[in-house]
From Swiss-Prot:
Its main location: virion. GO terms for cellular component: helical viral capsid; host cell; host cell nucleus; ribonucleoprotein complex; viral nucleocapsid. Homomultimerizes to form the nucleocapsid. May bind host exportin-1/XPO1. Binds to viral genomic RNA. Protein-RNA contacts are mediated by a combination of electrostatic interactions between positively charged residues and the phosphate backbone and planar interactions between aromatic side chains and bases. It is found in: Virion; Host nucleus. This is Nucleoprotein. Coiled coil: none annotated. GO terms for biological process: symbiont entry into host cell; viral penetration into host nucleus.
Amino acid sequence: MASQGTKRSYEQMETGGERQNATEIRASVGRMVSGIGRFYIQMCTELKLSDYEGRLIQNSITIERMVLSAFDERRNRYLEEHPSAGKDPKKTGGPIYRRRDGKWVRELILYDKEEIRRIWRQANNGEDATAGLTHLMIWHSNLNDATYQRTRALVRTGMDPRMCSLMQGSTLPRRSGAAGAAIKGVGTMVMELIRMIKRGINDRNFWRGENGRRTRIAYERMCNILKGKFQTAAQRAMMDQVRESRNPGNAEIEDLIFLARSALILRGSVAHKSCLPACVYGLAVASGYDFEREGYSLVGIDPFRLLQNSQVFSLIRPNENPAHKSQLVWMACHSAAFEDLRVSSFIRGTRVVPRGQLSTRGVQIASNENMDTMDSNTLELRSRYWAIRTRSGGNTNQQRASAGQISVQPTFSVQRNLPFERATIMAAFTGNTEGRTSDMRTEIIRMMESARPEDLSFQGRGVFELSDEKATNPIVPSFDMSNEGSYFFGDNAEEFES
């Protein structure tokens, strides 16, 4: 929990390590990404991919998905027990794209899961290397966060679509561990809890018996994870109430939705990590870079450095804008889907536009799309500056809430004001302050009302030149205070279909 004195850094969560010093953490994260890189190189050899094909992000995603599927114990067991027509539970595969006579062709490949597991373990010194698998899951999750909207999922659980900025990590699989829990947004945790409570309301046996006991433990654990994301005493006290409820029902759902709304201004601590596609690590390992010796961090300069020197390609549909495709992948690489566009634009050095203005669809290509008209382009993933990733919501001075915006969850530790429409947010809090949590609700509303949009978050924090790897000279950008900074403004993205 973030509240106890046992904070582990993301890197420790990512590598399953106990407390380590900075050098050990850098080494173990380095070991993790070099394992991913070695695995990727081996897969390219197995599939006889050319250098160009191996740098294609769509091929990287297929290979990543294959290894995640090969290690998905629960699904593998389920598939063996419920054989479905035409699905071999022991095999995994996907589309691989190859260049043939000046055209891109799609080839569906199939591999034994056992074989994939063997290659993965071999690349990771014989270990299962769960941390590396989680790392790939987080990269896929960050890509989904930048690509799709979750309006339907929000509405289904009774939440407001404008709360999209709280939904980081909403497509992460259940098995993503502590590193996964750290990057989940407040809205994601609330949605998982509401789904659980609804099942309990509809199914009398959900909380009963031996299974029910396990369910209850999972429920309390999720409540504790969410509690640890809140930074004010009143929000945490409300979470205690929700967790201790004998028979969670509609009152708890109400409380959770209230808390999610409050997080638009009293933001939660949500971790951000730059997780890159496997092919990027593969390229670096192939060029002789020794991650373990050099060390690596997901929250410092290293991912920026790596992207400065990597050439990754992407398939482009006929009417897509390659620059927009690059923006999408850049945001995914830095987990910046919910960051203020003013900050992202400054760091990237080119204007980052809201999603409603992007002429691009997702990175993955559906199996029914026509390959004849597909082209490929280099993704521009370089940046002008680098900045440290944050794990706080950017609330100003200690526990007092600062301004949040209807859709920002800061990614970079860079000074800015957080523009928000207080009237819009506060309108959601009229009325209901009675019941067991009334004093906490009143306290939370009071804190929100005293938040000022002109307050600075991350005071004195700046970005750094790419040559400044020790972060000695912060450059504090000045932003146009009034500017709308939301990526999801005027959104028209596709819904995420699980």
